Amino acid sequence: MEDNYQLITKTAAGLEEVLVREIKALGAKNVRPMHRAVICEGNKELMYRINYEVRTALKVLKPFKNFFAKNPDDLYNKVKEINWCELLRTDQTFCVDAVTTGRFFTHSQYAALTVKDAIVDQFRDVYGIRPNINTLNPDLRISLHIREDKVTLLFDSSGESLHHRGYRKQVDKAPMNEVLAAGLIQLTGWKADCNFLDCMCGSGTLPIEAAMYAMKIPPGYYRKQWGFMKWDDYDAELWQRIREEADAKICDFDYEIWASDRSPKAVAIAEGNINYAHLQHDIHLMKKDMHDLTPPEGGGIVIINPPYGDRLEEDDIDHLYEEIGHTLKHNFQGFQCWLITDDAVALRHVGLKPTAKIPVWNGPLECRFVRFDIFEGSLKDKKAREAEENN
């Protein structure tokens, strides 16, 4: 049986606890959260499963070397001491991605170039030739992490970031990252036990991720390539078994998933993505402004990703948020509504009292994922009903 080793799975800031739950559900041991990552112990099977089945994973990294370095010369010499000829062939390609923090290495790109130089110089010394660099689709992607003087070299088993699911063929402006969308859905606590609505769907990422979650479609279902497929120890039989076991869990969904947007361009793009994912019979897509929407009966979850940051002129923001609040209050009674925004001032114009605020990051933007419970009748009536039920 294969020995366990350490795995580091990266995610977006704010989704660490969601990622912990997903990885624990796969049977990982010694799982603990870090900043934008989760560390655990596992084997090749777990590494494959995280890559294929975990919705909030961006990268799955396998550490292989730790050492200390306080300057570029130290880094170069320590990297060159590693026998890269056992890890890479001259006819293969590689690249180095770097993340650095602390006072010793302040430029991540320079640190990555230092590691690259050490590797190719070793090959020149031994063979007189060197492997080439390929930043798009290398045979081996090396991840360099430096915190102060502590250096970790890791193999990137994912290759292209896992938020590239494979179903999104077109995007509208400023599309939501698929991993963030999957994380927001899980942060709501939705268990696929009621309706799901996205009233500003843009490219359709949130409703597609909701359908995949509800129907247990693995996040890697539409994807073709992973970094570990080019490793010498790639186990195609194990990978095939893992995919078949995960795909066998795909099921139907008994409630409604609605997606709408007032932009004809956005709806056309969303339609193309939904069709490519073969979810056109599972997602009800329409071109309709939010305030004209009559939601399905029975309540449910609403997630709204309104234009913000560079997506909207400042003069329009306050009016948009006022309109959102008015529409939620009058049209979405009985729904639990969530809104993601980076604009705390505009958020006050919703005019509803939040029942939860969760900090998350949407790329470089620090945001809040805010919950509004839209009661049927007044809050006073709801509390009176709850008091009667408890007596």
What are these regions (language model features)?
Residues E2-P138, N390-N391:
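Non-catalytic nucleic-acid substrate-recognition regions in nucleic-acid-modifying enzymes
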Residues T11, D261, T341:
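Short beta-strand/turn micro-motifs composed of small residues
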Residues R49, V54, E160-R165, K169, ...:
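Flexible, glycine-/basic-rich loop-and-beta segments that form/coincide
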Residues T101-F104, S161, P307-R311:
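A short, flexible beta-alpha/helix-coil linker loop
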Residues I142-S158, V370, L379:
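C-terminal edge-of-domain segments
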Residues L154-L187:
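SAM-dependent Rossmann-like transferase core, predominantly class I methyltransferases
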Residues M176-P295, D310, D318-L320:
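Conserved S-adenosyl-L-methionine
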Residues D289-D292, P296-N391:
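C-terminal catalytic and target-recognition region of SAM-dependent MTase-like enzymes
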